[in-house]
């Protein structure tokens, strides 16, 4: 009964719909012979036979003599016996969330009366590393690396080896999707940060304070051929350019001595507030292989003015909608790195197909155009083209 309770809990936890009462009500025929498999389905979709599943899927095996189970394995990973329910003609077992030591693409069932196996492929999720939450975190400060499946690959507090060059980062906390770490005091800018987990053959490198290909020179802002609409906002700094010394409400720069743009004002529904328009020069490396690059920049939002579902900002002809998922972007007064693939499409791409490389010019703009009237208090800086991770 304990095993059945565990399975029933697993079903309710993942919202699988199984006719458990019907199964329990059936007379259980004694399993006296070697086990046989006639069909494998997902527990919540008995109609369609499957030959593979994902981690944590609940699998239903149909056949004969499946009672008196001793073990169930996917590849060489054994299912916790407490999570198995077995009877003469049916067996339920979840695919464990664990990397196999050896991939055999087989399901193995052993009972007191014999064993049976059947080809069955378990999809193994890849390690996903999005990068540092703030690629320009100052030495000594803490930040987060986001991604997925860190636990599977041994990126834990105990096992993770994270360093910038030879400087070791202190891992403070680790979950399936995030690592919290402290940047070492002796970390050097423009040095790769490497991550090595206990289940990884090779480390993964991500950029730390890598300037990439800078799009703007804030020491020559708005630049030759560029213009802003700052004249419409007399209370703003000249051309929206700041260095953090302006007073209350102005965040500290991303790094010492850096400048940034701050826009704090209202824009009407479907308005067209041009923060900057002009020409940029796109490096030949980027125009030759745009799919390998991101547009990266750092943002800082006032906690009272997150970027919600109505936010739209044009980068060139690309329409950035950071809150479209329903989760607002709010950095609560800190700086955070944003990344948008140059091959992504939202109305258009960030740089046009067939874009000519520098020294040719490419028309570009930054425009605030929300779908509903909203107040912005957004600071931005460090616009660059950066190579994608991996």
Where are these regions (language model features)?
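Short, aromatic- and glycine-rich surface loops/edge beta-strands on solvent-exposed regions
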Residues: 101-113, 189-199, 364-368
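Extracellular beta-strand ligand-recognition surfaces/modules
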Residues: 297, 339-384
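Extracellular/lumenal carbohydrate-interaction signature centered on repeated Trp-anchored short motifs
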Residues: 272-295, 329-332, 355-359
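Extra-cytoplasmic beta-strand recognition segments
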Residues: 218, 280-307, 340, 383
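C-terminal motif of bacterial Sec signal peptides marking the signal peptidase cleavage site
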Residues: 9-13
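Beta-strand acidic-aromatic groove motif in beta-rich domains, primarily in extracellular
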Residues: 304-317
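Short carbohydrate-recognition loop motifs
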Residues: 243-274
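Beta-strand/beta-sandwich contexts
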Residues: 15-67, 113-158, 189, 199-224
